[in-house]
């Protein structure tokens, strides 16, 4: 099984909240695709609560598009990580980490302005696979924590596992 890019970085050294360029690629038609690791929690130290991350998934996707789309950037998808420590965001374009961090900050401010659970987009049985598993209060707690902590940048070159480490971990 091939080793995925996300597993070639040392999760014990990741800062959070922080933005990291997880992958850059070019499509056969020449489009630049960038995948960002939006790390909300330090791996193996904390996780996002399931109801809060689910509510955030519904809100974050729209708010990030409001603040980041345009000027050569279009978000394809924002999805929560299975480990519940953040989100992956795939997009067309190559915005730098500072631009993404600014959009993330603005999106968290937007989350805090949502005052009623009924305002959560697609919160119904027809458009959501687990529509009863939401918490606006948990989403607010997550947003407040991100804003209070500030959003940094994780760099692949400082997080890269060495070839020796990878060989030891995956003999």
Curated annotation (Swiss-Prot):
**Annotated Fe cation binding sites:** 54, 58, 128
**Which GO MF terms are attached to this record?**
iron ion binding; S-ribosylhomocysteine lyase activity
Q: Could you confirm whether the keyword Metal-binding appears in this record?
A: yes
Entry keywords, A to Z: Autoinducer synthesis, Iron, Lyase, Metal-binding, Quorum sensing
List cofactor names only. Answer: Fe cation
Enzyme type, top EC level: lyase
Share an example GO biological-process annotation for this protein.
quorum sensing
The SS bond pairs are: none
Which Pfam families does the record associate with it?
LuxS
* Chemical reaction(s) catalysed: S-(5-deoxy-D-ribos-5-yl)-L-homocysteine = (S)-4,5-dihydroxypentane-2,3-dione + L-homocysteine
Catalytic activity, EC = 4.4.1.21
The record describes how the cofactor is bound as:
Binds 1 Fe cation per subunit.
Statement: the UniProt record of this protein carries the keyword Transcription: no
Q: Which family does it belong to?
A: Belongs to the LuxS family.
UniProt subunit comment:
Homodimer.
Provide the function of this protein. Involved in the synthesis of autoinducer 2 (AI-2) which is secreted by bacteria and is used to communicate both the cell density and the metabolic potential of the environment. The regulation of gene expression in response to changes in cell density is called quorum sensing. Catalyzes the transformation of S-ribosylhomocysteine (RHC) to homocysteine (HC) and 4,5-dihydroxy-2,3-pentadione (DPD).
Descriptive protein name: S-ribosylhomocysteine lyase
According to its UniProt entry, this protein's organism is Edwardsiella ictaluri (strain 93-146)
Q: Which gene encodes it?
A: luxS
């Amino acid at each position: 099984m091939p080793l995925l890019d996300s597993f070639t970085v040392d999760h014990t050294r990741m800062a959070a909240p922080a933005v990291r360029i997880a992958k850059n690629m070019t499509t056969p038609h020449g489009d630049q695709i960038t995948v960002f690791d939006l790390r909300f929690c330090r791996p193996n130290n904390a996780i996002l609560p399931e109801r809060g991350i689910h509510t955030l998934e519904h809100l974050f996707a729209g708010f990030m598009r409001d603040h980041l789309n345009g000027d050569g950037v279009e978000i394809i998808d924002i999805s929560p990580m299975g480990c519940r420590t953040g989100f992956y965001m795939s997009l067309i374009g190559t915005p730098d980490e500072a631009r993404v961090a600014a959009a993330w900050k603005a999106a968290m401010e937007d989350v805090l302005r949502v005052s009623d659970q009924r305002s959560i987009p697609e919160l119904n049985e027809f458009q959501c696979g687990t529509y009863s598993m939401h918490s606006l209060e948990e989403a607010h707690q997550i947003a407040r924590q991100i804003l209070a902590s500030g959003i940094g940048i994780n760099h692949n070159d400082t997080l890269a596992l060495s070839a020796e480490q990878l060989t030891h971990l995956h003999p």
